[in-house]
């Protein structure tokens, strides 16, 4: 299956955000730095939720290295990243775990909802731009208390990594992403 141009744009943005040191490659240290930043974004979240999210970042990085690091250099190029991340059979389990853990992190009360402040804090910690974050949250259809369902966000994260998807809420994250 050929990925949509929107899916390719989404994955290229994720690569740039995860490349924490800006050296053009993803390495275990990049995932550790990202994990630390995101876990710190919602201090009210419980330790078990924080640990789950940190573990999902480790699995995400470990999956990439296991699947792609053919030469054993401990790092992933943009081309290698695109080839596996847009392949649900090879990367789907890591995306599922990450989606569930990140969405749960935004629900420190455990009521099944993510309020805008927690959503924005987590997405800023990942490195997305605030206007894109706000547009995404609005696209998820917040309720009268300005909250979205945890399941809605988790499903949106899964869709973000689906190669056949276009015109999804997650596409708001790539609009003028480099501006």
Provide a role label for each language-model segment.
Residues 2-41:
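The feature marks the first
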Residues 2-6, 55-56, 93-94, 126-128:
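Short helix-capping and inter-helix turn/linker motifs at the boundaries of alpha-helical repeat units
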Residues 27-45, 75-90, 113-127, 149-163:
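Amphipathic regulatory helices of Ca2+-sensor modules
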Residues 86, 92-94, 101:
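General zinc-binding finger modules coordinated by cysteine/histidine
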Residues 159-179:
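Acidic/histidine-enriched, glycine/proline-rich intrinsically disordered or flexible terminal extensions
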């Amino acid at each position: 299956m050929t990925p949509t141009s929107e899916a390719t744009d989404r994955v290229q943005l994720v690569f740039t955000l995860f490349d924490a040191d800006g050296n053009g490659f993803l390495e275990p240290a990049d995932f550790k730095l990202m994990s630390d930043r995101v876990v710190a974004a919602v201090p009210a979240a419980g330790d078990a939720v924080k640990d789950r999210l940190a573990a999902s970042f480790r699995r995400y990085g470990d999956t990439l290295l296991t699947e792609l690091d053919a030469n054993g250099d401990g790092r992933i190029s943009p081309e290698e990243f695109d080839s596996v991340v847009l392949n649900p059979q090879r990367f789907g389990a890591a995306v599922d775990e990450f989606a569930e853990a990140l969405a749960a992190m935004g629900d420190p009360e455990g009521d099944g909802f993510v309020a805008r402040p927690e959503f924005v804090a987590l997405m800023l910690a990942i490195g997305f731009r605030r206007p894109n974050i706000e547009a995404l949250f609005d696209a998820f259809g917040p309720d009268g208390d300005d909250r979205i369902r945890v399941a809605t966000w988790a499903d949106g994260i899964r869709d973000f990594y689906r190669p056949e998807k276009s015109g999804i809420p997650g596409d708001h994250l790539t609009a003028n992403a480099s501006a």
